[in-house]
Amino acid sequence: KEFPEDVGLFFVMFMHYLELSPGEAVEIHPGVPHCYLEGECLEAMACSDNVVRAGLTSKHKDVATLLRIVDYPSTSHPKIKLPKEVTKGIKEYPSSYPDFKVVLVESSEEVTLDQGFPFLGIVLEGSATTQHLDLQQGSSYLILEPACIQPTPYLKFYLCGVNS
């Protein structure tokens, strides 16, 4: 609809179509083309010096680089992952990458975040207080040390940190 004459439209026919429910995740390996069509998406990436666009965007497109690095596996859809509860109110998404892990703090009771620092996080719903911060919906935070998080009254807080 937004890019009706973009040649990137043909590329869509070669991609897997997945429909995820809230809270579900997929792990996409380096070099595998991906995009999302609608909704909200949290994307965590390993350290890299490239994001290569080939279409469906008004930003710079680098088709030559994409063709050089692309890895298009002929396997079935990526496996949908759900987070595993680490402790009450804290869930972790399984990651095969040492570079990062994604953690979800979702609670209406106090929780203690005590490992995996530093974390970069965004509050999707609710608010909370910690010893040093007031966490507000729509804001992002850098968490450098253990924190007791007291939701006021509910918190949904996604964090990305080093996978230890």
Located regions from the model:
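Short acidic-glycine-tyrosine-enriched beta hairpin
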Residues: 17-37, 42, 105, 129-149
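C-terminal, non-catalytic macromolecule-binding modules
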Residues: 39-92
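Conserved short histidine dyad/triad with adjacent acidic residue
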Residues: 22, 86-91, 98-116, 145
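Glycine- and acidic-residue-biased ligand/ion/polar-headgroup-sensing regions
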Residues: 1-7, 37-40, 107-137
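Short loop/turn segments at secondary-structure transitions that flank enzyme active sites
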Residues: 34, 48-50, 163
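Extended, charged low-complexity segments
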Residues: 141-164
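Conserved AWS/pre-SET-to-SET junction and N-terminal core of the SET lysine methyltransferase domain
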Residues: 1-22
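N-terminal non-catalytic cap/leader segment that marks the start of a structured domain
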Residues: 100-102, 117, 122, 137, ...
